[in-house]
Amino acid sequence: MKFVLIGAGQRGMIYAKYARERGHEIAAVAEPDGIRRQIAAEAFGIPEGACFHTGKELLEQPKLGDAAIIATMDRDHFQEAVPALEKGYHLLLEKPISPVPEETLAIEETALRTGRHVSVCHVLRYSPFFRELKKAAAGGKVGRVITIQHNENIGNFHIAHSFVRGNWRRSDLASPLIMQKSCHDMDLLVWLAGSGCESVASFGDLTYFREENAPAGSARRCCDCPLKDSCRFSAYRCYLPVAGDWPAAVLTEDQSEEGLREAIRTGPYGRCVYRCDNNVCDHQVSILRFDNGVTATFNLSGFTDRMTRTIKIMGEDGEIRASEAENEIEIIRFASTGREAGEREVIRPEVAQSGHSGGDSGIVEDFLAMLEGRLGTSATDIRESVESHMMACAAEEARLTGTVVRIADFRRRHERKQQA
């Protein structure tokens, strides 16, 4: 099977490498960054004539493969996904589908009309950890699920890197925080609740990473700052110790100390975190009600030490406590009194070696199985994934307007806009 790769950044290269390892050909690449384009061409043996600057250029060619991996920036997905589907490509599409509801719905409509498969990279559904959690929730061990408490702990260093200095710092250039970081989590909540979402309320803001919170005497860039040796957000302290690994690997292809220092001196990751042009939230709390009566709270926060997810699922007969970082799922059956301990079971799922706890390789395997006829429908088929995107968009609308948003009404409103 032949793939074309549109977007040879970190995510696109991961998916393409898994496809290649399973014996499939990466036949063409589109990537505006010349160095990344060259790296992809060398890694996959792509001839110069099949290397393109943009997805538009690649998609103007005669069909070059069976499927396209689209892993460009959020706001580029629509202009690449629709022509790719019309051209006859199946899609492995990085999330989010699009930050614009009408574009998300248009991609879904095009996929259904053309009969092409679209798998959205909600990779967490494929990790052993979340598969075990789903099995525990759906298996009746705590009875019927009543309510869910879900925390996405972004990690303080991670929010500074990706959502203050980085590519996803502005909702107008990429997506709101809840879409970019947490359409994953909206998808998990639908999956764990076993139902579509009825309504959502949401609250949050950009509270801390603002100029008024900058330390006295600090500078606009770390290279000029007298506090660069002591500030926890100093780019020198954030990136030099992890040269060659994420997140330093995002700054530049040259991971030598000299290369990183130059990137810090001249690039966006060397800016003071209090003086960037970021506008996405640094924390957001959402309250959700599902069609089957399950309720959930979702806390998305950059003010955490660890970068992990913690979940509590509360049922009629017990509760499930899960920590992604600890790789532990604890199931507790309620006792008759507070003096006795309830029946307790601890599950430690298989530890996968690939990214996102095995989800990165899992979604590629799932996509390949679907294209090869070994699987009927992907767990993250476009029709499944649109639900989580409507939830994330509705949550952002609820946050901005201070209202409770009904998901069905929200979707109908944007369907009318998309069809207009």
Where are these regions (language model features)?
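N-terminal Rossmann-like dinucleotide-binding module
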Residues: 1-46
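Beta-loop-alpha module in the N-terminal Rossmann-like domain of NAD(P)-dependent dehydrogenases
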Residues: 9, 49-110
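Short, conserved SAM-binding/catalytic segment
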Residues: 39-48, 106-114
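Rossmann-fold dehydrogenase core element
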Residues: 106-123, 143-148
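Predominantly a Rossmann-like dinucleotide-binding segment in NAD(P)-dependent oxidoreductases
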Residues: 124-271, 402
